[in-house]
Regions:
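Acidic, low-complexity intrinsically disordered segments
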Residues: 1-67, 290, 299-305, 310-339, ...
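Terminal amphipathic helices with adjacent charged low-complexity linkers/tails
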Residues: 3-11, 61-65, 100-103, 109, ...
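Glycine- and acidic
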Residues: 34-36, 50-59, 82-88, 147-154, ...
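Flexible glycine/acidic-rich beta-alpha junction loops that bind and position SAM and/or redox cofactors
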Residues: 47, 96, 149-155, 184-192, ...
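Alpha-helix N-cap and loop-to-helix initiation/capping positions
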Residues: 61-68, 155-163, 192-196, 236-243
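Conserved SAM/AdoMet-binding glycine-rich loop
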Residues: 73-218, 222-226
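Long, polar/charge-rich, low-hydrophobicity segments
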Residues: 198, 202, 206-210, 233-245, ...
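C-terminal low-complexity, glycine/proline- and small-hydrophobic-enriched intrinsically disordered tails
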Residues: 208, 242-356, 363-367
Length: 368
């Protein structure tokens, strides 16, 4: 529109204490969610993981103060009848007031639910595991992402094997019941990466035995997604261009050989359609309308293989090439989302992309 100034700048609330958290709302009569609510403790992430949209789209990292969180919890408990509160955060263990927050909440409400956390922060703080044990948390989820240190550098994970082992040592000592480790299939895996992963899983099993732990260890593998507004927007979308099932089978073989559980969380068809819609522009609108309205496709858990075949037919009829959307891009390429300014320059994203493809990384900062 002529009256809109481009690029459109994102509306960022820099002080979370100035906005109300989710204290009230409909109380749905659903057995699983009854009495459960979320409390946002922070927004964004201080890290630079190249694959993570939240890490880039929601910068700068901001925290809600402990006093406002306590006030919000009491209000939410009264208005929604909560007995369980989930700490809503991309990585809850980055919060400055983590310990006083958890312990004060535990005195206010029956259950405090904590989601995924970072291995590196866990590895430097044995007390964090003890606090989680006090509040009854026996299931822990952490992102390892790349199966080797080389691939984790590409993903800018800032995580080495010794940190993972140390974190797992703390967890096993405290008798956790389940550990879920998230992995990412990058499409860049080579024989040395599989070898390193095999050694890691064996050593993890040995650590479990030495700790006399009965922990259930689950590895969950997801194909890499290349989000807009991140360094990976320039990368060739390898996991969408070709089904990397051989990589998944090898990771599964290694896990099961060492008596670990393995899961895959997304199919090739899902990542293909997700990536195409993310990289797409308005020329895909007729295909989207046809798929949804004419062919009646509604996503529910899976994307059938026939949907992928349908979309390739749409592309052919529209004179479009899926390869053009999924190819590697240069620093001067124009993206459909370039008219949206999220506060991170395209130049900086390009520089970080250069680090990623050369398997190097910079440190992140918590600003403390």
């Amino acid at each position: 529109e002529p009256y809109v100034t481009y690029p459109v700048k994102s509306a960022t609330v820099y002080d979370l204490d100035q906005v109300r958290t989710m204290e009230s709302g409909p109380v749905w009569y659903e057995t699983e969610s009854l009495g459960v609510g979320s409390l946002q403790i922070s927004n964004g992430c201080p890290c630079f993981c190249s694959f993570c949209a939240e890490s880039w789209e929601r910068k700068p990292y901001r925290e809600r103060s402990l006093s406002m969180l306590a006030k919000g919890l009491r209000s939410a408990k009264a208005q929604q009848g909560l007995d369980t509160v989930s700490l809503f955060s991309f990585n809850f263990n980055t919060h400055t007031d983590l310990y006083p927050m958890i312990l004060s909440f535990y005195r206010e409400i029956a259950n405090v639910s904590l989601k995924s956390q970072r291995f590196d922060l866990l590895s430097t703080d044995r007390f964090l595991v003890e606090v989680q044990q006090v509040i009854g948390k026996t299931t822990v989820s952490c992102g390892m992402e790349g199966i080797s240190e080389r691939l984790r550098r590409s993903l800018h994970k800032n995580l080495n094997e010794e940190q993972i082992y140390k974190a797992c040592e703390f967890l096993f000592e405290r008798g956790i019941r389940e550990l879920k480790i998230f992995l990412i299939c990058t499409g860049l895996e080579q024989s040395e990466d599989f070898g390193e992963f095999g050694n890691f899983v064996k050593r993890l099993g040995d650590l479990k035995c030495m700790a006399d732990s009965n922990v259930r260890i689950i590895f969950s593998l997801t194909p890499l997604y290349y989000p807009p507004h991140t360094p990976l927007q320039f990368h060739e979308c390898l996991t969408a261009l070709e089904d990397k099932k051989k990589i998944g089978r090898e990771v599964e073989r290694i896990c099961k050989f060492h008596d670990m559980e393995f899961r895959e969380s997304a199919s090739y068809e899902e990542i293909w359609l997700t990536q195409l819609l993310a990289m797409g522009d308005r020329r895909l609108t007729p295909a989207l309308i046809r798929s949804s309205l004419t062919d009646g496709f509604v996503y529910y858990n899976t994307v059938p293989k026939q949907i992928l075949r349908n979309w390739r037919t749409y592309f052919m009829e529209l004179g479009l090439s899926e390869g053009n959307y999924l190819r590697a891009k240069g620093k001067d390429d124009i993206f459909p989302w370039d008219d949206i300014d999220l506060g991170i320059s395209k130049k900086f994203l390009w520089e970080e992309y250069g680090r990623s493809i050369h398997f190097t990384e910079r440190e992140y900062c918590l600003g403390r």
